[in-house]
Regions:
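AAA+/SF3 P-loop NTPase mechanochemical coupling elements
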Residues: 138-143, 180-198
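Long, basic/Gly/Ser/Thr-rich N-terminal segments
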Residues: 1-29
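Conserved AAA+/SF3 P-loop NTPase catalytic/coupling segment centered on the Walker-B
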Residues: 146-172, 204-211
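P-loop NTPase catalytic core of nucleic-acid-dependent motor ATPases
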Residues: 20-153, 162-164, 215-218
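Conserved catalytic/switch belt of AAA+ P-loop NTPases
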Residues: 163-188
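Conserved nucleotide-binding/hydrolysis micro-motifs of P-loop NTPases
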Residues: 154-155, 200-204, 220-225
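Phosphate-sensing "switch" segment of ASCE/P-loop ATPases
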Residues: 189-192, 207-242
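Conserved catalytic/coupling elements of P-loop NTPase cores
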Residues: 154, 175-179, 196-201
Length: 242
């Protein structure tokens, strides 16, 4: 007779400190995984409030250089984005808004995702997809997403602009999402996902008047290596600052 395999409730709950509990029933498996940075967070850094993000340069100069560049050097936008990230990091909840980074190729948008966002929040919890991937039928990767980064995005590239606009608005703001995996029934689960759109196009998203779902950073027209020629050599310093 084969070994007995107990049933367990499988969830993704970033707000819970419980992980895998298979000692006593009811059995429970939480798919959320804290990163090493979350587990070893320093308590000696002074508390910052909205309006003081610029003082972070004292502690993370290279990270701030990269963020300021991809945000088009907008002072207000940097302040708001840092606050947005901090809220997600501290609360693991949806913000109900998305960010759009626009600029010429080589501004460092991808570097930010791979060198800062993914290490801080977890590789599995920060999937990066193209628009075509979002439109495909199966989206199991969204089950454990704190962020979805949409690369080279332009809404006009969709076969049906209106349908895609409605779909994105729904996903940015709705507290639940429908997960579709191969050979299983679709299920509706709580959504913890926040969206970042990366694009080289200035007309990436059609924003209707009064729509407050999108934060749009000033467009960056200069490559990162042009404005900061020595930055690539400092990538190790960026990760050391986290």
């Amino acid at each position: 007779m084969p070994d007995y395999i107990p049933d367990a409730q499988v969830v993704f709950d970033p707000a819970s400190n419980s992980g895998i509990q298979m000692d006593t029933a009811p059995y429970h498996v939480n798919l959320y995984r804290k990163t090493g940075y979350m587990l070893g967070a320093s308590t000696e850094v002074p508390e910052l409030t909205y309006g003081t993000a610029g003082s972070m340069r004292k502690y993370i100069p290279n990270t701030m250089t990269l963020m300021q560049h991809i945000l088009g050097n907008g002072v207000t936008e940097v302040e708001h984005f840092v606050n947005w990230l901090a809220y997600i990091y501290q609360n693991k909840r949806k913000t109900m808004t998305a960010w759009i980074f626009t600029g010429v190729p080589g501004t460092g948008k991808g570097l930010f995702v791979h060198k800062i966002l993914k290490p801080l929040f977890g590789e599995q919890q920060v999937p990066m997809r193209s628009l075509e991937n979002i439109e495909e039928q199966f989206n199991l990767y969204m089950r454990t997403a704190l962020f979805l980064v949409v690369d080279e995005f332009r809404m006009g590239d969709s076969g049906n602009t209106g349908r895609m606009a409605d779909k994105l608005k729904h996903q940015v703001t709705e507290p639940t999402l429908t997960i579709r995996a191969m050979r299983t029934n679709q299920i509706e689960l709580p959504s913890f996902c926040n969206f970042i759109f990366l694009t080289n196009r200035a007309d990436a998203v059609k924003i209707e008047e009064g729509d407050r779902r999108y934060n749009v950073a000033p467009r960056q027209e200069s490559k990162l290596e042009t404005e900061h020629p020595d930055f690539i050599a400092k990538l190790a310093d960026v990760q050391a600052e986290l």
